[in-house]
Amino acid sequence: MSTLDRSIQARARAHLFGLLRAGFRVIPLSDATRDRWRSWFLDRHADWVPEPVRGRANHAISRRPTARSDEAAIGHVAYRTIALPETLPATLVAFYLPQFHPIPENDAWWGKGFTEWRNVSRTLPQFEGHQQPRLPADLGFYDLRTPDVMREQARLAQEYGLGAFCFYFYWFAGKTLLEMPITQWHADTSITLPFCLCWANEKWARRWDGRGHDVLIDQAHSADDDLAFIAHVARYMRNPKYLRVGDRPLLLVYRPHLLPEPVQTAARWRNWCRDNGIGEIHLAYVQGFERPDPRDIGFDAAVEFPPNMSTPPSVTARQRLVNPDFSGDVLDWRELARDMEQRPLRDYTLYPGVNPGWDNEPRRSGKGRIYLHASPRRYRDWLARTVQHRLANAPSAHRMVFINAWNEWAEGAVLEPDARLGYAWLDATRQALTRAPDVATEICSPSACVVLHAWYLDVLDEMLDAIVECGTPLRIIITTDLTKVIEVTKCIQRRGIQAEVEGFENRGRDILPFLHVANRLLDENVQLVLKLHTKKSTHRDDGNAWRGEMLTALLGPQRVDAIVNAFSTDPLAGLAAPEDHLLPVTEFIGGNADALDYLTVRTGSDAPDTNSLFASGSMFWARLEALRPLLDAHLHASEFESEQGQIDGTLAHAIERFVGLAVTHSGHRVTTVEQTLGITKTPSAQPYRYARKAP
């Protein structure tokens, strides 16, 4: 078949698929029937699904990492121990993939020594901001044949609040694959973390999704196989650490509609367990491909399995491609979280699920399905709201949340520590169990903090004078170059000022140090910051006047208490800057258009319009919660250009113009200091003196 013929055939199939989908959506069907028909069609005709829209190629500047793939990002969290309360509000059950050890079958199908790590380590970023390869941190590229690996996993899971692992169990008509880790967990008395099994009852296919015709090993369901299966897993269910609902062992099935007779299968299992000393069991299925009422198929409960069964909007077209041939699909993970956390529970037993991200590019090179913009904080909020709200009326035995997943490294669903963010996902899991989902917005003076970047030390005293003389006690954090820490420390000691001093590499001007500190302060529940820096603008002859005007507006007598109070009483106030220095982004974009485009795409924010404002000079009051779109992007220091005295066109200059966009994207408002103080000021008719408008 010629290339032209294939193209015509593909277009015809895409058109027919669109017609079928439109008709399918208007037919009145129950969710269960709709899901079953969809699965039937995709199992047989997955190649009919049109390719997603392509991203953008040939952008001006490449922002692909060039040095290394294991750099810690803003938001990296180190291991830390924090005591958990004796009673947790829910049992968290994380799905666990046992594919991290070689077996003869995988050797034959994928090559000698294959484990999931081979997929993980070969992956390349497909677009700018695509965080691949994702590499493990403290646990390394582990081999599950080593017992200490699973012991360490169990210890970490318990320290960070997880209540159980749910192991995928692979059974093919009497043949098991990847069972060794489960057997090891079952037998190791030093491991006390409970576990349960989920029978992944799909065929294995070379596509990695249980679909397609290139089958590696198939299922052969029958009544005899039902009995052989339950007899095999019974030894695990007899284990005292096997997870129970009440006193009933919990057994999951991944795709119940692949069972020819699920009602009869469930009955056979129950009867066998009653007759063989197990007693009653609790049967649940995973809502990965279908959503029947579990009672209709002889089961007791269902388990949500995000990101499956969700349709967040595609953001593929916005992406700045690294691989111009990338034909995968990029979706907005934040919309997945927003949708799932608001879903009501059903009138049957449904265990809610959460997900810390998804990216199966390692298994589908150049064609991955990627859920972008996942972040530990937003995952924490999703999990906390699920526990606090969705489970509010659940009986104690049913207060379970399933997490997809503990270690799906080749599908980007991972709680284990990674090189980029460390223990951030585990830390977020623990926080979700120990703090309210919505932090109080009331602000008082002790929660307001000054973050001052000191590069020009000859004006540091002037700025410290302004802080001290404002009349309001403020926590002071001074960032500076690593070579200037001692001199800054001597300055504050000489003045008798209480301040914290932090040294950073001279990269990213005042912006990168501020992002590091702001990220930490947000985790400490500090709500409000005043961002300052020792601005001189040595390429100008009026840099001192620029700095002086902003200090007067931001720290003038009797202003600080009033500004803090204004933020406290107006929860939508996100950023306040001096009125004379709050400018339209589009009129002062300078040489920053490409970097600004990168930031809007990287954070999933809207491009600037005529109403978008920025604080020229980068000094302002800000609610840290309003900066989350920027902080939750987890930028790397290496993305900031090395210091060469640039006066425009760097990522730091672009972020100066982007901060206001982040604030509005978070749902907050950019305003002026004067408006927060109730001061009416006549706008100046003179051109802005400290920057030129874009031509």
UniProtKB/Swiss-Prot annotation:
Disulfide bonds: none annotated. Pfam families: Glyco_tran_WbsX, RgpF. It comes from the Bacteria. InterPro entries: RgpF (IPR007739), WbsX (IPR032719). PANTHER family: GLYCOSYLTRANSFERASE, RHAMNAN SYNTHESIS F. This is Uncharacterized protein WxcX. It comes from Xanthomonas campestris pv. campestris (strain ATCC 33913 / DSM 3586 / NCPPB 528 / LMG 568 / P 25).
